């Protein structure tokens, strides 16, 4: 069995029942200037128990496609956001 990809990001919003939108930041080196620049991407994450709120930092793990855009499940909440 292959290892599942894990991503860590900040919850931007609750996109509906059992779904959260997270923002994942990654750092890549610019090909010409050799400086690290930030790249951002949004993912939809399945939150079975509706545990997350906006501002939380979470870890999500890859799973089978649950909808057209949702392929990650909530694994753990790393830090709670400001209430």
UniProtKB/Swiss-Prot annotation:
Domain of life from the UniProt record: Bacteria
Keyword Metal-binding attached: no
KW Magnesium (keyword) present: no
Entries under Pfam families matching the protein: Ribosomal_S17
Self-association state and partner proteins as the record states: Part of the 30S ribosomal subunit.
Family: Belongs to the universal ribosomal protein uS17 family.
Name used for this protein in its record: Small ribosomal subunit protein uS17
């Amino acid at each position: 069995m292959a290892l599942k990809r894990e991503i860590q990001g900040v919850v931007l919003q609750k996109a509906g029942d059992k779904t959260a939108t997270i923002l994942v930041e990654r750092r890549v080196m610019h090909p010409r200037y050799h400086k690290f620049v930030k790249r951002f991407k949004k993912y939809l994450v399945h939150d079975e128990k509706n545990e997350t709120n906006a501002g939380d930092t979470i870890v999500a793990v890859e799973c089978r496609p649950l909808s057209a855009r949702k392929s990650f499940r909530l694994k753990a909440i790393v830090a709670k956001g400001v209430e």
